[in-house]
Every structure is written in C-alpha cells, then in structure tokens.
Amino acid sequence: MEITALTALELGKKIKAGEVTVEEAVKAQLEKIKERDSVYNCYVTVMEEEALKRAAEVQKQIDAGELKDSPLAGVPVAIKDNICTKGVLTTCSSKILNNFKPPYDATVIEKLEAAGAVIIGKVNMDEFAMGSTTETSYFGPTKNPWNTERVPGGSSGGAAAAVAAEEAWYALGSDTGGSIRQPSSFCGVTGLKPTYGSVSRYGLIAYASSLDQIGPIARNVSDCAAVFETIAGYDAKDSTSVKMEDYHFTEALVNDVKGLRIGIPKGYLGEGLDPEVKEAVLAAAKTLEEKGAIVEMFDMDMVDYAIPAYYVIASAEASSNLSRFDGVKYGYRTPDFEDLQDVYKKTRDEGFGMEVKRRMMIGAFVLSSGYYDAYYIKALQVKALIKKGFDDAFAKYDIILGPTAPTTALKMGENLSDPLKMYLGDIYTVSVNLAGLPGISLPCGIDSSGLPIGVQMIGQAFSEKTLIRAAYSLEQTRSYERPACVKGEN
C-alpha cells in the first residue's frame, strides 16, 4: 500500500517512528496531485516549493522531540480556498479575488502549523461558498473521484474530492448550510461541522457570519477527531468564539453506544428521499440499535421551513459581507471605467459569478424597506423556532440521525439551470447551522450506481464527544471504501 492510502493518523505514527520522513510524505502527495488533479481539479493552488521548505522545518522539530504531543505532525493538509493563508493566493474560487494574497494567517492555520502540519495547497470550492456542487467556481468544476460525470458536492467539493482521491490526507473546509457534510457524503469520506463558536472564524472569508463554521474532512472519524482537537479553542479575535470545558475529543473514540438515545425525525424520511439512501440510513440505525443504542422515530417541528429561512438569512448576510469587494483596495478591478461609481459597478458585475449575484440580490431584496419585516425578521423567528425544535428533541435524545443528503452525487450540470432544486438538496443540513449545532457525516453504504451514501448525526451544542463516539462505533462495522479509480492506481 502506498503511503497516500494511509489515514492521517497512520501517517503521523509512521513519521514519528522514523519510518517515513516529512519530505517523503510531501513528495508522495505532490506526485499524486500531479498524476490525478488534471482529471479531478481539486486544487486552485499547489504550494510545492513552500511545502518542501516547511517539510524540512517540521522534520527538524520532530527530530528534536518538539512535537511529541501532536499526532498530525508532518502530515500534509489541504485548505479550502476561503481560509486565509499569509502570502498565498486565497481566491474563494472567484474572479474578484483571483489575485488576492492575504497579509495574515487564519487562526486555524496558526493552530495547524503550531501542531506541525504542512499545507500542501488550497482547494477548489463553489464561489464564495455559495453552491452545493463546486460547479460555480471561477476555476472550473471539481469532479467526483467515484464517477467523473458526477459532482463532488459543495461548497467544500475540492476538499472532499481531494481526500477521496488521495490527493490529501485530510482537509479543512467550511460549512454554512452543509458545505462540509454534503460533499463528504457525495465523496464517501467523513466530515465534521463543529458547534458554532467552537472553532475560530478569524481569517475565514465570510459568507454568512452567523452560520459559517470551519471543520475537518478526512477518511475516518479518528482523523476528524484529531484535527478538531487541533483547531478548536477560544480566540479573542473572533467575537463569537466560545471557551469549551473539554478539548480532548480523541478520548471519545470508543466503540460503545450502549444506552445512547437516538432519534430519527419522521420528516427526514419522507417525500424526495432516494429509496436507496433511506434504506442505507435505516440500516445504519439498525446497526447502532444492535450495538445497544435505543433508536426511535419521532416528529420534529419546523423541518419544512428550514430551507426558506436559511436562504433568506444567508443571502441577507452575504449581501452585506460581499459589499466589501469593490475593486478599490484588493482583488480584481475592471480595466475599463469612467468614474468611481463605474469602478464599483463594472468590477462587481465582471468579478462575481451568476450564483453569487443571485444570492446578493435576494439578500438586498429581503433587507430592503418594506420587505425587511416580511422576510428577514420572519426568517429569524423561524430560526429561533427551529432551535427550540432541536432543544425539545434533545430533551429526549442524545443524537438525531438521518440522511446527509436526499440523493447520492448528482450528474454534472443537473442543478446549474435549476437553483431551486440545488437549494432543496440542503434540506437535511441547513437546520443544523441555523441552530448552531454540531453534525457529522460518514459513509453508510453504496447505491446501485456505485456512489457513496452518507448518514448524518446531529448533537446538542458542544456535544462533539457524543457525536464522535456514535460515529466511531458505526464506522467500526464497515471498512473504508475507496473509489475504483483510486484502487486501480494503487
């Protein structure tokens, strides 16, 4: 087995034991990217020179015994291209930021580097994280390693596809309405969306500030737990950051769900859910029940209102957040203009893609006088009711289980002409962001087309340890499946 097929923690152990050097790991990863990325288009920027230089630095630290407590020391990582990396292109996969190099690192980058991580590159995404397919990227779509005619999901599609294609051992993504969990489901990998406030957003280029959250995508639950343990923590630079009592998430990697109360909302299994996805999710629930969990179906209020509330709130915040991109201080500027107003108008028209413009227009509309109360305030009220619905459910259950997405990976181009269909694909994930809760997606089966199916587990705020334990226990009942194209090459 090639080292690129190892999990991040397995590679970390080999590096610590001196069986693999950091330079060898980096070179092996770069080789895989060169071999495969012309097909999958996972990367926007590959940091070959920087990664090799960093590998030598980290190797010295490991040899000096400085990184003993870091299980991921020396392991290369891919970073979603909306997370700031000092002096390295950070584009949000948009023309308007196609030349932007931040003057600072995001807090999560500082935390990873302090733990001995080596950043190998920046991965593709839907433009400004707006999309569910990674087809809205200015740098072209990313393809799903399981089937190149299918999308990898989004908006962290480059991150999930890179992990599945073994072009990255693990990656950092961001999740505003499902952008870590849905691509993880489509690409057959594991993705954790942490509780809002548990991971600093400082240096994450904002889409919807009250919903955005950075989290890990990896090949298994253990890797996700180790990465989350590394990046979580209070940060004074993020006003929504929260101090947690316990950051030892890898302690929860225990194969035991006895007595765990798991609820499945009936509304999650209704109309629009692919029968094969439903079967796989119910089989996962049955497995947990056989291992000692108590599994019940229940009614949960407000599920049907999550999509409209989410798109009103997220679009409103996006229209405000993206007003800073105007061609004056940084990023793309139109070469042809008459005055300052013309600069603003043409730069934004030429610099933003169609989906971003659509959401900014929706946002500007719902915030305008006459519609503010009817749409935005009402959406905030629905958000509060959704949170109450979850609170009521968690009075009875430890975990809520359901599908991550209503289908497996869609065909390329299928959703671009029908935005409403794309928005409805987020039906099981957006409510988790609206309530600020943690959620994890992990593989639970393969459909008749040979595409992976993901199951989602949702926990109470700051209950990641319970989620990790349940997900890890389920994961132990099936082996990790690799895409056929990857198996064929290794």
Short names for language-model regions:
Residues 1-53, 290-292, 365, 483-490:
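An N-terminal boundary/leader segment
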Residues 25-29, 309-310, 356-364:
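Short alpha-helical scaffolding segments that buttress acidic/His motifs in well-ordered protein cores
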Residues 29, 51, 80, 112, ...:
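Conserved hydrophobic/aromatic pocket- or pore-lining residues that grip, position, or stack substrates
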Residues 31, 35, 39, 110, ...:
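Structural helix-boundary/capping segments
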Residues 72-214, 267, 316, 402-420:
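Short glycine/serine-rich loop/turn segments
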